[in-house]
């Protein structure tokens, strides 16, 4: 197992290198000039050129890339063009809200979707199953930002049960912290819940058709025991796989969700940096997102060995 983990970690290096090259040059060919934004709308060409020289943007692109790679190899993601603060510090300051939102969404989605999928498989072609399939279709069809605005309108504007926007750190109290995450977690997790519920249903249906499940039922074992100890355990690998894929989608989805709910996390920082053409922040954030996705995939692959004894690395 240790050798497999080391091989996977080494295999991530080329992936991260490709991401770094792609991000750097894509930003350079994208329209917009951070020097022009800093200089202002009425700035002269000479003023803009002076700002570009100060930022080092007047150097050849390959020279800029080599300098950035050298700093990156030393763990330095650079300095923000606008705030003049280290990118690592900015990311660290915004990390807590994003991690809290991602974990809360993951908890809500898994806690709701897996039981729903199991019930749908057990009650196949009955009312419960049809309701779950309708929810799955709607979950895939409704965009996350639309779900966010609908939830805000119903539960924050009309019913006034929850705050419209805003994130409260856990240091300010547990309930304000949870209260600020309820709507964003549901909005971000709608598609995720639909995906997990549908895969859980499909995987459970396949397992429930096996002979050993019919044998367990014929012996008079309790339905809960059959479903949880025999069926769900053997259906876990596909479910865990889709949970891992969904986490990668959640990491990308926080950009829109944090913007809608005004959460000061990495997603909001990404939007602000892209609009300002703050190259160091965008480059650093995309590398962090890519590394998180690679790490999640590694954890999911390792979990297979614990879920299925037949899998060995």
Residue ranges of model-derived segments:
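An internal, D/E-rich "acidic patch" concept
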Residues: 58-114
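Short hydrophobic, aromatic-rich alpha-helical segments embedded in or entering the lipid bilayer
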Residues: 43-76, 182, 213, 262-272
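Alpha-helical transmembrane segments of integral membrane proteins
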Residues: 2-3, 13, 92-130, 144, ...
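Hydrophobic alpha-helical transmembrane segments of membrane transport/permease proteins
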Residues: 15-66, 82, 159-180
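Membrane-water interface segments at the C-terminal ends of transmembrane alpha-helices
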Residues: 22-29, 59, 70, 134-165, ...
């Amino acid at each position: 197992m240790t050798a497999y983990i080391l091989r996977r970690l080494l295999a991530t290096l080329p992936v991260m290198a490709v991401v770094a090259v792609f991000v750097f040059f894509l930003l350079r060919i994208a329209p917009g000039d951070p020097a022009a934004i800093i200089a202002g709308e009425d700035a002269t060409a000479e003023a803009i050129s002076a700002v570009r020289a100060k930022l080092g943007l007047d150097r050849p692109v390959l020279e800029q890339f080599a300098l950035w790679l050298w700093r990156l190899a030393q763990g330095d993601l650079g300095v923000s063009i606008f705030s003049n603060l280290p990118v690592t510090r900015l990311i660290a300051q915004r990390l807590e809200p994003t991690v809290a939102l991602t974990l809360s969404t993951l908890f809500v989605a898994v806690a709701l979707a897996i039981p729903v999928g199991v019930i749908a498989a057990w009650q196949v072609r009955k009312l419960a199953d049809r309701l779950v399939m309708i929810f799955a279709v709607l979950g895939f069809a409704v965009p996350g930002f639309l779900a966010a605005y609908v939830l805000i309108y119903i539960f924050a504007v009309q019913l006034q049960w929850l705050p419209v926007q805003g994130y409260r750190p856990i240091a300010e109290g547990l309930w304000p912290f949870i209260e600020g995450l309820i709507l964003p977690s549901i909005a971000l997790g709608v598609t995720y819940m639909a995906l997990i519920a549908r895969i859980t249903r499909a995987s459970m249906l396949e397992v429930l058709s096996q002979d050993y499940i019919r044998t367990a039922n014929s012996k008079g074992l309790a339905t809960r025991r059959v479903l949880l100890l025999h069926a769900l355990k053997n259906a876990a690998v596909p479910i865990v796989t889709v949970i891992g894929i969904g986490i990668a989608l959640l990491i990308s989805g926080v950009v829109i969700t944090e913007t809608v709910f005004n959460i000061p996390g990495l997603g909001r920082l990404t939007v602000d940096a892209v609009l300002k053409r703050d190259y160091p922040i965008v480059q650093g954030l995309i590398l962090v997102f890519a590394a998180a996705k690679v790490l999640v995939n590694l954890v999911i692959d390792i979990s297979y060995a614990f879920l299925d004894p037949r899998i060995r690395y």
